[in-house]
A protein has these predicted regions:
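A conserved beta-turn-beta hairpin within the catalytic core of GNAT-like acetyltransferases
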Residues: 65-73, 82, 101, 132-136
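Conserved beta-strand in the GNAT
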Residues: 50, 56-64, 71-76
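Short amphipathic alpha-helix that is part of the acyltransferase structural core
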Residues: 1-43, 48, 52-53
Length: 145
């Protein structure tokens, strides 16, 4: 049984700790992202999500408003729970929540995640770039009628 909750870090510190644990495992430990880059000044302004699988937090994400629209960020699923469709469930929930805001929806995708986001209506924009020593493309959600 899957459950997805949304929260603010400053309102639900117990959920913030669970989200940070997933991000630590995926980004800092697996991908060697510098913790100073992983945890930033936007933690308390972003809306965060946790996906629970049988009451265990296994995936997280966040979104925030920027000058360029709504930026989806920090999508991470624990290694043990990948390729089970959980990322798609989480992405769909986030998109359901932000789509009514009528703003551009975009993200910075690691190269290996591009096919996942393309399956969900995102397209690559511009040139490849490095963020936290990992190659990325900016991607934008195309309007779906």
């Amino acid at each position: 049984v899957n459950e997805i909750i949304s929260f603010r870090f400053d309102e639900r510190p117990e959920f913030a700790a669970k989200a940070n644990h997933i991000r630590q495992s995926v980004f800092v430990e697996e991908q060697n992202v510098d913790p100073a880059l992983e945890y930033d000044e936007y933690e308390n302004v972003a809306t965060h999500y946790l996906l629970f699988d049988d009451n265990k937090p296994v995936a997280t994400a966040r979104w925030r408003e920027t000058a360029n629209g709504i930026k989806l960020e920090r999508f991470a699923t624990l290694f043990s729970h990948r390729n089970k469709g959980l990322g798609a469930l989480l992405l769909q929930r986030v998109l359901d929540d932000v789509s009514a805001r009528s703003k551009r929806i975009y993200l910075h995708s690691q190269l290996k995640a591009i096919p996942f986001y393309e399956r969900h209506g995102f397209v690559k924009l511009g040139e490849q770039f490095s963020e936290a020593d990992i190659e990325h493309f900016e991607m934008q959600l195309m309007n779906r009628e």
